[in-house]
Amino acid sequence: MSTYTPKAGDTTRTWYVIDATDVVLGRLAVEAAKLLRGKHKPTFTPNVDGGDFVIVINADKIALSGDKLNKKFAYRHSGYPGGLRKRSIGELLQKHPTRVVENAIVGMLPHNKLSRQVQKKLKVYAGPEHPHSAQQPVPFEIKQVAQ
């Protein structure tokens, strides 16, 4: 008897909604990455995209442990000499809270040919509203909440 290998059309995708209010960023990213890849399913195969859709709401209310709001930085470079720019995560959370959460989750995903396809299933919103109510997302509870 040969091993069962799921095909791309064999998987049923569920929509999950995660409320990021007072949840530590790293713990949220780990759980969201597991759902996006499909590692929680018994039919998980690393070379097939069998993961589910993930909606993250309240990204502006995410928690960071320690003093990371002021001491952790995001760097970017223009390509010109002296063009290195840095912003603290606290500044980024005020301007673009969805980018901070997206970058944390995408950083937990493998960087291979499937990564772009898996990233398209991630939807992040700063407030409590999202336009995906027609998909009937299931609430996903993260156990650890910031103190």
UniProtKB/Swiss-Prot annotation:
GO terms of biological process kind: negative regulation of translation; translation
Which Gene3D superfamilies would you find in this protein's record? Ribosomal protein L13
Which molecular function GO terms apply here?
Answer: mRNA binding; structural constituent of ribosome
The family database entries (PROSITE patterns) matched by this protein are listed as: RIBOSOMAL_L13
GO cellular component terms? Answer: cytosolic large ribosomal subunit
Residues that span the membrane, as ranges: none
* Entry keyword set: Ribonucleoprotein, Ribosomal protein
Q: Which CDD domains match?
A: Ribosomal_L13
Top-rank taxon, per record: Bacteria
Which family does the record claim for this protein? Belongs to the universal ribosomal protein uL13 family.
What job does this protein perform? This protein is one of the early assembly proteins of the 50S ribosomal subunit, although it is not seen to bind rRNA by itself. It is important during the early stages of 50S assembly.
What's the subunit arrangement here? Part of the 50S ribosomal subunit.
User: What is the protein's name according to its record?
Assistant: Large ribosomal subunit protein uL13
Species, as recorded? Mycolicibacterium vanbaalenii (strain DSM 7251 / JCM 13017 / BCRC 16820 / KCTC 9966 / NRRL B-24157 / PYR-1)
Lineage, top ranks: Bacteria, Bacillati, Actinomycetota, Actinomycetes, Mycobacteriales
